[in-house]
């Protein structure tokens, strides 16, 4: 059922809308972590390093599609808040054509550049064989990623966060079951883990597409053969491409750091692969809360409800900070037991490095929690370019400091670069908000047109 976030109690509306998104991403992390956990436990540290590096690469590639879908979703939310049915349908058609074209191009490039990845990511020879086998299969799932994220973004934009959760749950359970069967039962190795992921992706992508087309009459506009107005393409591009740039820059920075991590050898690669999964579980709820917050802001922005936006912002900051403080304490205390979920107790070097990473990152989750809210805010009020600026500051700082500090203090310097980047981006985003807040929260069609240009 679609939910109108422009009415009802502010925090209750936001939290109830966010809950299925958080549960869905928990399942997504289970989905992503299944390969890592099963491979690490049953195939060893070299295979774990291969899958971990592959995950960073796939996150970068799919972030392009995710950014396009998120940007389109922000515009869908604004049109839904305006009750502009015609503009919403036209935006749906324009965005689908644009993102489908990018998906097909990206898929072709991914396969064409397969053998260039080894040198770009500085993958050790003993890891590359498993990594190549894994990514050659998971690249086939890029189209399924487009299907799921496009239709999930539309459903969330109009207030339906339950249907995406259902299909994610189905695919997560299927992925874990197939992982166990392919890797342990059939001894397919890393190729089995990759195959399990791709099958699960297509089940969720095709399933949510069929359901959305049945439930949402606006999506039937996709069947129309009437010309797509150039103004709608520009409007969608203005939102989607900037959000795509934000997501891509974010994950390109992570990919560059992955290359630096790889230069320290298989043990550090394996520690990073496991710790990043734990990290993602820890701050994932505030990431999804930030996305729910963005939909809330966008609907109310389109409806012109500035006071409701202000109340939502204050409440969202409080919820995010309280959650991050609690999770930081838990990760700090239980860092070693968490690492033992992914690696055997005898792998002392891997465990020690993973614990060091979690103690540094985990102490500063408030920084990333606030940053997710800032990303969501600027995306929702027709300022996606500001989200790009914050991402460049955060990731630019991270990459530069990672290379500088690691040359002086070793791999620990890479870990310290992350929270420093969060802090600088937070300060920039907050200062910009307080300088421009009156203009930011005032909706007008001219705001959307400025985004196009």
Question: What name fits each language-model region?
Answer:
Residues 16-35, 137, 171, 200-204, ...:
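Transmembrane helical elements of multi-pass membrane transporters/channels
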Residues 48-108, 145-164, 271-335, 368-382, ...:
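Small-residue-rich hydrophobic transmembrane alpha-helices
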Residues 7, 11-30, 34, 57-64, ...:
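Residue-level signal for short hydrophobic patches within transmembrane helices
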Residues 60-63, 175-179, 205-209, 281-284, ...:
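Hydrophobic transmembrane alpha-helices of multi-pass small-molecule transporters
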Residues 21, 25, 37, 74, ...:
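Transmembrane alpha-helix boundary and packing residues in multipass membrane permease domains
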Residues 30-49, 118-125, 181-188, 248-277, ...:
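Helix-terminus/linker motif at the lipid-water interface of multi-pass membrane proteins
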Residues 69, 137-156, 164-172, 193-208, ...:
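Short runs within selected transmembrane alpha-helices of multi-pass transporters and secretion channels
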Residues 1-18, 76-141, 185-241, 297-364, ...:
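Short alpha-helical transmembrane segments in multi-pass integral membrane proteins
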């Amino acid at each position: 059922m679609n939910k109108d976030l422009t009415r009802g109690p502010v925090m209750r509306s936001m939290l109830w809308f966010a809950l299925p998104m958080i549960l869905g991403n928990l399942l997504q992390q289970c989905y992503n972590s299944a390969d890592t956990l099963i491979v690490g436990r049953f195939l060893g540290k070299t295979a774990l390093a291969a899958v971990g590096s592959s995950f960073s690469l796939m996150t970068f590639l799919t972030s392009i599609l995710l950014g396009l879908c998120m940007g389109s979703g922000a515009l869908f939310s604004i049109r839904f808040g305006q009750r502009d049915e015609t503009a919403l349908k036209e935006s749906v058609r324009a965005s689908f054509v644009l993102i489908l074209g990018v998906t097909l191009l990206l898929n072709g490039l991914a396969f064409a550049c397969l053998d260039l990845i080894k040198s770009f990511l500085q993958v050790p020879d003993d890891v590359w064989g498993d990594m190549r086998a894994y990514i050659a299969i998971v690249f086939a799932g890029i189209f399924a990623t487009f299907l799921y994220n496009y239709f999930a973004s539309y459903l969330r934009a109009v207030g339906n966060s339950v249907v995406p959760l259902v299909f994610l749950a189905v695919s997560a359970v299927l992925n874990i079951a197939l992982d166990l069967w392919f890797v342990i039962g059939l001894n397919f190795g890393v190729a089995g883990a990759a195959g399990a992921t791709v099958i699960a992706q297509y089940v969720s992508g095709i399933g949510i597409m069929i359901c959305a087309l049945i439930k949402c009459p606006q999506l039937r506009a996709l069947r129309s053969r009437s010309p797509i107005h150039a103004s709608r393409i520009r409007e969608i591009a203005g939102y989607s491409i900037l959000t795509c740039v934000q997501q891509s820059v974010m994950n390109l920075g992570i990919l560059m750091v992955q290359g630096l991590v790889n230069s320290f050898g298989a043990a550090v690669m394996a520690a990073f692969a496991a710790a990043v999964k734990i990290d993602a579980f820890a701050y994932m709820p505030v990431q999804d809360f930030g996305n729910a917050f963005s939909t809330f802001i966008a609907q109310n922005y389109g409806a012109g409800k500035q006071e409701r936006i202000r109340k939502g912002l204050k409440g969202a900051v409080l919820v995010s900070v309280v959650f991050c403080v609690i999770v930081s304490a838990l990760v700090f205390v239980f860092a070693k037991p968490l690492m033992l979920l992914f690696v055997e107790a005898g792998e002392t070097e891997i465990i020690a490095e993973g614990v060091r990473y979690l103690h540094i990152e985990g102490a500063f989750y408030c920084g990333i929690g606030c940053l997710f809210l800032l990303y969501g805010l600027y995306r929702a009020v027709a300022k996606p370019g500001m989200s790009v600026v914050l991402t460049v500051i955060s990731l630019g700082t991270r990459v530069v400091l990672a290379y500088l500090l690691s040359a002086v203090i070793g791999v620990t310097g890479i870990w310290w670069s992350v929270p420093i980047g969060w802090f600088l981006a937070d300060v920039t985003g907050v200062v910009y908000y307080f300088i421009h807040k009156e203009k930011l929260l005032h909706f007008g069609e001219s705001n959307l047109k400025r985004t196009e240009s």
